[in-house]
């Protein structure tokens, strides 16, 4: 079982994720992304879904047209873990190569 990040671990890890923010009332992080169009957003979600399946760690997300809202938390640990940080870093890398909204 994975362990929940301590306050110090959380602070250190989140320094690498400036586009993510804390979810009020939860031990979770979130990010909203905008893409050029629906196809770009769906392609992003597909790449993340493949990685999430490999990790057996799945995001909470919501998609409308070119917007994707992502929330990460580890349910087994009831909070933020290293797995969330790893997936957030992957999401940032994929988003960096996508066509942004104009």
From Swiss-Prot:
Species for this entry: Burkholderia multivorans (strain ATCC 17616 / 249)
NCBIfam families: PRK00823.1-2, PRK00823.1-3, PRK00823.1-5
Catalytic activity of the protein: (4aS,6R)-4a-hydroxy-L-erythro-5,6,7,8-tetrahydrobiopterin = (6R)-L-erythro-6,7-dihydrobiopterin + H2O
Molecular-function GO term, any one: 4-alpha-hydroxytetrahydrobiopterin dehydratase activity
Record bears the keyword Cell division: no
Family, per entry: Belongs to the pterin-4-alpha-carbinolamine dehydratase family.
Pfam families, per the entry: Pterin_4a
Annotated coiled-coil segments of the chain: none
EC category name: lyase
Keywords from the named record: Lyase
Superkingdom field: Bacteria
Family matches, as InterPro entries: PCD_sf, Pterin_deHydtase
EC number: 4.2.1.96
One Gene Ontology biological process: tetrahydrobiopterin biosynthetic process
Protein name in UniProt: Putative pterin-4-alpha-carbinolamine dehydratase
């Amino acid at each position: 079982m994975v362990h929940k990040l301590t306050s110090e671990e959380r602070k250190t890890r989140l320094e690498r994720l400036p586009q993510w923010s804390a979810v009020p009332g939860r031990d979770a992080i979130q990010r909203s992304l905008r893409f050029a169009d629906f196809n770009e957003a769906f392609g992003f979600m597909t790449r993340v879904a493949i990685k999430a399946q490999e990790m057996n760690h799945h995001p909470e997300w919501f998609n409308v047209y070119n917007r994707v809202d992502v929330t990460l938390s580890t349910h087994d640990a009831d909070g933020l873990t290293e797995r969330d940080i790893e997936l957030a870093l992957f999401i940032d890398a994929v988003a960096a190569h996508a066509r942004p909204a104009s």
